[in-house]
Structures are given as C-alpha cells and as structure tokens.
Amino acid sequence: MLHKLLAIAQAEIGIREEGGNNRGTRIRQYQRATDLPPGPWPWCAAFVSFCVQQWLIENDVPEWLRLTRSPAQWQPRTALAYGFRQWAKDRTRTTSIYTDKDPAQPGDIVTFDFSHVGIVLEDAGDHLVTVEGNTNGKGERDSETGDGVWRKIRPKSLARNFIRIHPAR
C-alpha cells in the first residue's frame, strides 16, 4: 500500500515555487494541508502532510491501515518537520518511530537534524534517496534556498528519525 504514497510523492517532483519566497498555487495547496494559513513559511512538512492526506483518499488505504477513526482524524496536519514525531506518538497503533541507526524503508517519513522532513524512496546504506518539498536540486544540506519538490540523495547521518506507517496492531 505504501507504493501508492510513493507514487503520489514522486508525481510532485518538479513542482516549483512561483516567484520564490514559498509562493505558488501548488505550494499553497500543500500549506492548506496543515493547521496554518498559507503564507511565506517553509513548507517541507506541509508537502509531506499533503502527500499522506492524498494517499488516504485512496479507498483501500484506510481499510489497509485498519483505522478506528476517520481518515481526517488520523491524517497529519503539521507544518513542523519535528511535528511528525508527535503525530506518530499519538498514533502508535499505525505508526512506529525508528532511530537513524535503523534501516529505513520506502514510504518512511524521515526527519532530519536540520528541521526538515521528506519521504524515503530508498535506504542506500550510508545515503537516503528521498522526495522532499521546499528544497533544491543542489547538494546542500538545508532547505533555506528551497524552491520546489525534488528527489534528493542525502547522507543517512543527517537523519534524526524514521516514522513508519503500517496497519494497526
């Protein structure tokens, strides 16, 4: 089922801000997936929240997760990269938190030490292949110069946590 989440995230690769400064029609859609009003704020977490929300629209996903509440109550709405950890802690039946020392799996949400978040495509040993919003196509560590949704390769040492979504236990 996580392949559908990966497909949603990967379909966004290439979306760019319009005029910089965290602006643009699609960027506003990402930001509306959070509890904050759209504005000139970093949107990496909004991108991940948006992707998970779109994934939940798929008819078979809530059933696969075995949700006991509505998808709208389960979905993330955080605009903070580190907010995903609390989101996962509040959903221990359907999420697990792993450290940066654990292997990542495709579909994991990865939080980075520099207050950034993305979706894991692959754990390549000492590097992660991810899809991230509010980043750039350069090899830079942070997202201060972010301008779009990109496929990134980052050192795994920059990861803080992996949040794995799974069927209810």
Question: What feature does the model see in each segment?
Answer:
Residues 3-4, 125, 160:
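Sequence-level motif detector for i,i+2 pairs with an aromatic at +2
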Residues 1-69:
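N-terminal capping segments
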Residues 25-39, 111-154:
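Glycine-rich catalytic cores of cysteine/serine-nucleophile enzymes that process amide/ester linkages
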Residues 14, 18-19, 105, 131-133, ...:
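Intrinsic disorder/low-complexity signature
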Residues 146-169:
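Low-complexity, Gly/Ser/Thr/Pro-rich intrinsically disordered linker/tail segments
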Residues 58-138:
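...with weaker cross-activation on analogous glycine-rich loops/strands in unrelated enzymes
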